[in-house]
Amino acid sequence: MASVVVKTIWQSKEIHEAGDPPAGVESRAQLVPEAPGGVTSPAKGITKKKKAVSFHGVEPRMSHEPMHWCLNLKRSSACTNVSLLNLAAMEPDSSGTDSTTEDSGPLALPGPPASPTTPWAPEDPDITELLSGVNSGLVRAKDSITSLKEKTTRVNQHVQTLQSECSVLSENLERRRQEAEELEGYCSQLKGPRPDVLTQENCRKVTRSVEDAEIKTNVLKQNSALLEEKLRYLQQQLQDETPRRQEAELQELEQKLEAGLSRHGLGPTTPIQGCSGPPGSPEEPPRPRGLPSNGWGMAIRAGEGPSLSEQELQKVSSGLEELRREVSSLAARWHQEEGAVQEALRLLGGLGGRLDGFLGQWERAQREQAQSARGLQELRGRADELCTMVERSAVSVASLRSELEALGPVKPILEELGRQLQNSRRGPDHVLNLDRPAQGPCPRCASQGQQLSTESLQQLLERALTPLVDEVKQKGLAPACPSCQRLHKKILELERQALAKHVRAEALSSTLRLAQDEAVRAKNLLLTDKMKPEEKVATLDYMHLKMCSLHDQLSHLPLEGSTGAMGGGSTGGAPPKRGGPGSEQ
């Protein structure tokens, strides 16, 4: 199975190698020289220069191979900290001082350990703490990488913005240069063979324009220089900040790993001797490249630490492989969740737009509902006014009927008047007969108690007045006495009043029927609740028109009632007037 173990790479100016070579040749990558006599002394004066920590793949040795481990350290040319740790192959020595080149070197370990110690137990609770620390370190490293990516993206965007501004400024500079050249050409044309006052003024204007253009060009150059300097500063800051952040995170993770492994006795038991320096200076002792004094990496390189069993190494490797898979799955899940969040934000934006539209429609519906409520309130008020008008018209009709009933005794009075006119034509001897009906109540008037309708009253008036009118027209004689004139005027007035009463009664009865029908229809419409807004508006318009027409029709009802009352008063005063001429005669 593929196993992965966390290793530390210490990067400095050189990469040193530790361990005994297989052929007995002393390796130049040893860190501490061996003391004579086989006695080892602890390493002293080792200076640390830590750069970064990265995660590397480790391949376990085959079952048929001896315990000669080979440590292969590589560094990419892009200054990244990702390397492969090959423990199964040997590679030739190579070292370099440049940080942008690849460094590699073999590192061998002796097979049997110097002092075997008890391997760590699988059930040790510190393994869980170690794995949790590794997991938290991986999460923090992932967070730092994510933050660095975001900052790099922002800086790149800012750099692109500055580049676009620089390009715009360069275009403006080129344009100003062309304008200056054109102005110089125009100025040279103006300085022709006839330099008069106008030409000199134009030359001065052109000179001022050229000076202004030069000033603007200088300002643009200064701005461009400032922008370029700012761009370089941002790039330098980005390049300086990224390694520092990675170095701090990886150093913290390495310290936790070393602390966890040192508790299990994996530290070095014997110091390690160094070997010759780099190829450039063979006499100078090599400087350790940030190796910890009690770290796991030094124990492995020196080969003096206890060897772990195959099963424990496989467990640790499988656990770290699972951690790596979990980190990758977490990263993939984070990207998926980010996409889901973006989609949710887009959906929320669309929902917000729809909600704004719905709120606008709801406000319009509320305004329309308020208008409908006001219209219904006005309709109720007008219906109440219509009911009061109908009541007034009913009262007017009742008074008119009472007045018409009071006109019942008109027929005997007219007959008596006709007889008196005939007697007045016969001679003055019959004048005294007119006083007789005035002395007491008329027997016909006393016996006449029945009620006459409007049609019968009209017929009686026509039969009573027609012979008198015909006789007056035929003779063409003016009445001789004042009593005849008064009687004639009273007859004409009674005829006009009777006709007016009849017409008014017919109009009032028809108007009353219409008003009752419209009132019933208005009440039915008001009782109808389940109506659409459009139907309510149409119904309100229709009711408004109908109410206006009814108001116009019923506006004359109080006037007609008062007229009827006046007519009744005049009619009630007719019998006393009838006795007046008799007394005068």
Curated annotation (Swiss-Prot):
Residue span of region Disordered: 91-126, 262-309, 559-585
Record-level GO cellular component terms: centriole; cytoplasm
A Pfam family reported for this protein in Swiss-Prot or TrEMBL: TSKS
Keyword Cytoplasm: yes
Subcellular location(s) per record: Cytoplasm, Cytoskeleton, Microtubule organizing center, Centrosome, Centriole
Gene Ontology MF: a single term: protein kinase binding
Keyword terms of this UniProt record: Cytoplasm, Cytoskeleton, Phosphoprotein
Main location as per UniProt: cytoplasm
Residues with PTM Phosphoserine: 224, 281, 309
Keyword presence, Cytoplasm: yes
Bias-annotated ranges (Low complexity): 91-108
TM segment ranges: none
Post-translational modification: Phosphorylated on serine residue(s) by STK22A/TSSK1 and STK22B/TSSK2.
Disulphide-bonded residues: none
Job description of the protein: May play a role in testicular physiology, most probably in the process of spermatogenesis or spermatid development.
Protein name per its UniProtKB record: Testis-specific serine kinase substrate
